From Swiss-Prot:
The gene is Apbb3. This is Amyloid-beta A4 precursor protein-binding family B member 3. It comes from Rattus norvegicus (Rat). GO terms for cellular component: cytoplasm; cytosol; membrane; nucleus. InterPro entries: APBB1/2/3, PH-like_dom_sf, PTB/PI_dom, WW_dom, WW_dom_sf. The lineage of its organism: Eukaryota, Metazoa, Chordata, Craniata, Vertebrata. GO terms for biological process: negative regulation of cell cycle phase transition; negative regulation of transcription by RNA polymerase II; positive regulation of protein secretion; regulation of DNA-templated transcription. Its main location: cytoplasm. PROSITE patterns: PID (PS01179), WW_DOMAIN_1 (PS01159), WW_DOMAIN_2 (PS50020).
Length: 504
């Protein structure tokens, strides 16, 4: 038997009549603005129309002064004890409640590793291709979140959005994001993960439950940013999505390395997630940023926002901004270099600071959104932090360095798979030579060089062990092990976490 809360939800969702004109919905006098009184078979309850929340208790006015003074009253929306129609109230995490349309059994029937999240679609906004460049993508995504959230609050829906304003179940599984109807679990939309270009989480006040992703629409041939309001902090969805993309990348690289001995075709960029391909294309040329070079400082650990903030604070306290050196920071996919701006024209002067991208272990934006720092591994358990002061903020520089790290990691994976392919081609050549020798000399032994390096000989094992131990090293370690802080919006108020791969 369904509980009262769930019965209310079913009645409202399946009601075909005009709810506003229904005689059971009463705009009773004395209720705070936005509240309606509803009577049905489940009983009498109160519905807050703007938020969709319901409660059994009659909402009350809380007067700032005595009611007899005639001053305007102030009302407060107290936490409802009933079911919220605007959300599923973390229904997937309930342990002691009744099922709603076999919801719990559906969750149990999902494939291992799949995760469900209760969301509501706010619609989509078209995004130009140029807005997805490093330094711009986070701003573009956050603008989409703000635009759709504000439009939704003004009850001005964006035309053409599938499922807009509808409660959904977002199911993240191995290779796709599925959006389902929470009542009958019918499929509303299926989005392959490899086609998702960018995703993000709102960071301004009240937007930490807004999640957005950008993907191409095959019908309209445009990039669309889809925005959702979540019942849980949206970072949970972003983290799960990041883990699935990392898993796809590692599996494809592993398969490419093992299948190289069977396929003569070179590794195609299509074998890797689209997000990494974009970073590779963007980072072909060095990007330059003006910043104040604050200096370097030895640190004790390779990663950690606390370590980075402490180092930035120490460098900030050593002197005021006048003592910092104006520099032009050049960021490529392999090297970062800071030159004094006064000496930019003359290439003879030594750079202020230089660091290969492969040595970077951690990046982040400090408490002051103008400050950016990174930690580099110098070897022998020695780590160094370099800090810069940026204007108007450090978001563009942080995204450029993140992109360089991911491109460097992609190149490392491609190189490892290419080495596996080269080993497979060499093994096939030896196998053909072995067969030819066997036909020409049925009873004769193979030449000593082939015995030493032939298939199954002593020479093949070290190569095979070397390739697979290299791949296993990445499988044993988290694919994205660094978590720098990158800002979407609200500088100095909230830091948004994005992972950056470490290149060994």
């Amino acid at each position: 038997m369904l509980g009262k809360d769930y019965m209310l939800a079913i009645i409202l969702v399946n009601c075909d009549d005009d709810l506003w004109g229904d005689q059971n919905l009463e705009g009773e006098t004395g209720l705070p603005p936005g509240w309606r009184k509803i009577r049905d078979a489940a009983g009498t309850y109160y519905w807050h129309v703007p938020s969709g929340s319901t409660q059994w208790q009659r909402p009350t006015w809380e007067l700032a002064e005595d009611p007899g003074t005639g001053k305007e009253g102030i009302w407060e929306l107290r936490p409802p004890k009933g079911r919220s129609f605007s959300s599923l109230d973390s229904s997937l995490n309930r342990s002691n409640s009744l099922t709603w349309y076999n919801e719990d059994s559906y969750v149990r029937s999902l494939e291992p590793g799949a995760k469900c999240f209760a969301v509501r679609s706010l619609g989509w906004v078209e995004v130009p291709e140029e807005d997805l460049a490093p330094g711009k993508s986070s701003i573009a995504v956050n603008n989409c979140i703000q635009q759709l959230a504000q439009a939704r609050n003004r009850s001005q829906p964006h035309d053409g959005a599938w499922g807009e304003g509808q409660n959904m179940l977002m199911v993240l599984k191995k290779d796709a994001m599925s959006l389902l109807n929470p009542l009958d679990h019918s499929l509303i939309h299926c989005q392959p993960l490899v086609h998702i270009r960018v995703w993000g989480v709102g960071s301004s006040k009240g937007r930490d439950r807004d999640f957005a992703f950008v993907a191409g629409d095959k019908d309209s041939c445009m990039l669309k940013c889809h925005v959702f309001r979540c019942d849980v902090p949206a970072k949970a969805i972003a983290s799960r999505l990041q883990g699935l993309c990392a898993q796809i990348l590692s599996e494809r690289v592993g398969l490419s390395g093992e299948a190289a001995c069977c396929s003569p075709d070179p590794i195609s960029p299509e074998d890797f997630p689209r997000q990494v391909e974009l970073l590779d294309a963007v980072s072909q040329a060095a990007q330059k940023y003006e910043a104040l070079y604050m200096g370097i400082l030895p640190v004790t650990k390779a990663m950690g926002m606390d370590v980075l903030n402490e180092a930035i604070g120490t460098l900030t306290g050593r002197g005021d901004r006048k003592t910092w050196v104006p520099a032009m920071l050049s960021v490529s996919d392999s090297l970062m270099t800071a030159h004094p701006i006064q000496a930019e024209a003359g290439a003879e002067e030594e750079p202020l600071w230089q660091c290969p991208v492969r040595l970077v272990t951690f990046i982040g934006v400090g408490h002051d959104p103008h400050t950016f720092g990174l930690i580099a591994d110098l070897g022998c358990q020695s780590f160094q932090c370099a800090a810069f002061w940026c204007q108007p903020h450090a978001g563009g520089l942080s995204e450029a360095v993140q992109a360089a790290c991911m491109v460097q990691y992609q190149k490392c994976l491609v190189a490892s798979a290419a080495r596996g392919k080269a080993w497979g081609a060499q093994a096939r050549a030896r196998l053909r030579l072995k067969r030819t020798s066997s036909m020409d000399s049925p009873g004769g032994p193979l030449p000593p060089p082939l015995l030493k390096g032939g298939v199954g000989g002593a020479g093949a094992a070290p190569r095979k062990r070397g390739v697979f131990s290299f791949l296993d090293a990445f499988r044993l370690k988290p694919l994205f092990s660094i978590c720098p802080k990158l800002i979407l919006e609200g500088w100095g108020k909230r830091l948004y976490t994005l992972p950056v791969p470490r290149v060994l």
